[in-house]
Every structure is written in C-alpha cells, then in structure tokens.
A protein has these predicted regions:
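Assembly/oligomerization scaffold segments
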Residues: 1-117
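Short beta-strand-centered interaction patches in the first periplasmic/extracellular domains
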Residues: 2-6, 96-98, 107-110, 114-116, ...
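Short secondary-structure junction motifs
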Residues: 45, 89, 147, 181, ...
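N-terminal export/assembly leaders
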Residues: 47, 120-122, 138-163
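PEST-like low-complexity, intrinsically disordered acidic/proline/serine-rich tracts
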Residues: 124-126
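C-terminal amphipathic alpha-helical segment
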Residues: 214-226
C-alpha cells in the first residue's frame, strides 16, 4: 500500500490537462472550462456538470451557447489527468443547457447523464413470461436501449410469472437487483449489476488531514434492523 498521505498518479501532480469531447471531437481550446463535477454512485445514474465561461457583454451574445456544440442529446466524454496522461472520467449525453448571468460574470452550464437516463423517462408495463430469471428479464429490458451496454451477473431468483406494471425501467431494474442482494452501477454508458465486494485489497487509503478533502458520515437508527 502506498503512503496514505498521498495519492499515486501516473504523472507528477502538477499541470492538470482536462479534455472535453463532443461526438468524439475535442471542443475548441478557446472555450474556458471553469469547473467540472463528476458524480457517480451505486443505484444512481452517473452525472456530470460543466461550467464554461461564456458571454460577451459588449456584443450582447453567448457564443458557446448559441452554437450547436452542446445541443441536448449529443454524446459527450470528459477526460482528465496530469501532463496530458488523461483517462476517461465520464461518458454520456448532454441533457440540459443553461446560461447564468451574475455581477461577477456569465456562465454556460452543461448537465450530462449516463445513457441509462433514458430508462427513467417513461413508465412501462410488460409480462416476461413463466419461469424467467431476474437477470434475464433485466438483460431484456436493458437491451431495448441504444448505446447502452449491459453487464448483468447471474441471479438465482426465478419468477413463475414476472410482471412489470406502470414502472420505469430503471425502477424495475433496481428493484429486482435489490431483491437479489445486488447493486446497480452506471459507468461510461455501461449498466453493471453485481454483488458488492466485501473482501480483497483496498484500492486506495485515505487519511483525514491529508488526502480526504470532504466527508459526510452519519448513523441513523431509524433504518437499522433491530
């Protein structure tokens, strides 16, 4: 295990080199990316937010916003690293495009989600037939979404008559996964469902006062099993 007071990097942690690609093409270097926020978690759809400095008060226009680069629905990829040794942090689609005007300046804010977001947009009803495994039903549902890859671990529960009734595909999938003691992950347009790993070697060790920047921890007795 490396020193817990530092986090190993492939290059010296000096110059950060972020890259944003839309439909596979890097955005112009003239666009000033002010902030990147990546949010990934279990049983949640991966999200990203870009804040770009945009707006010319003298010309009274927003060049980046007025263009067609960040039109909702376009594929986007965010990469970052040190000294151009970059790796992918997020892949997904643009879902929201907004501008903000403040006394301190103006911004273009782009919100993105993993392609699994399409699973949350409508409710469906479906009969899957007799004696079908939950993993097979989930694979069938996920296979109806273009651009989304499914990696579903085998599940032991078999239903005699499995029905999805007036539920979004995302709620149906997370519900069946929970019933089988599994977690749902969305990462780079891949839907992964597997059991949590509770053994093995730690990937990284974080230390309070050194590598831990923010932490929220709590215990809530209301949800503890007696």
């Amino acid at each position: 295990m490396a020193d817990s007071r530092t986090i190993e990097t492939t290059r010296p942690g000096t110059v950060v080199t972020p890259i944003v690609k839309v439909e596979g093409t890097e955005i112009p270097r003239t666009m000033q990316v002010e902030a990147m926020v990546i949010d990934k978690g279990v049983n949640r759809i991966a999200a990203a937010k870009l804040v770009i400095i945009d707006g010319d008060t003298s010309a009274q226009k927003f060049d980046a916003s007025n263009g067609d680069l960040f039109v909702p629905g376009k594929n986007i990829e965010i990469l970052c690293g040190y000294e151009s040794d970059n790796y992918t942090l997020f892949k997904g689609v643009v879902i929201k495009h907004s501008i903000k005007l403040r006394n301190s300046g103006s911004q273009l804010v782009i919100e993105c989600r993993d392609k699994a977001i399409a699973m949350t947009l409508a409710r469906h009803s479906k009969y899957f037939g007799e004696n079908i495994k939950d993993s097979d039903a989930i694979t069938t549902v996920a296979g109806t979404y273009s651009g989304l890859t499914a990696d579903v671990a085998d599940m032991n529960i078999t239903s005699s008559d499995l029905v999805q009734y007036e539920a979004t595909d995302w709620d149906f999938i997370t519900g069946r996964a929970e019933l089988n003691g599994m977690l749902v992950y969305t990462d780079d347009n891949t839907l992964s469902i597997k059991k949590p790993e509770i053994s093995g070697t730690a990937v990284v060790e974080l230390s309070f006062g050194a590598t831990m920047l923010e932490l929220d921890a709590e215990i809530d007795s209301r949800i503890q099993f007696p």
